[in-house]
Amino acid sequence: MAELRPNRVKNKLAAGLAATVVAGPHNAEMIEHLGALGVDGVWIEGEHGPIDYADIPDLTRACDLWGITSVVRVNLNLPGVIYRTLDVGAQAIVVPHV
């Protein structure tokens, strides 16, 4: 059976610690640089900015390589959009206009 990936942000918050989440990376290379700095999470902006849905799998894989939690803001508050975003690797979802 597949194992869930550790969610560094969730684990730190549950332990009462602060988590560092960086917003703005829009390519895997930027995420690799952040991974080397030890950030806990990356905010992938899917509502505003240059990120297209097709970019999300590569960005979440880059996060996985460094053990970084991928937090994705989806562009629509629709169950299908949220499910698909989780299916391609997002560990946390931010829903707009809620």
Regions found by a protein language model. Give the residues of each.
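Expand to "…catalyze enediolate/carbanion chemistry for C-C bond making/breaking, isomerization
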Residues: M1-V98
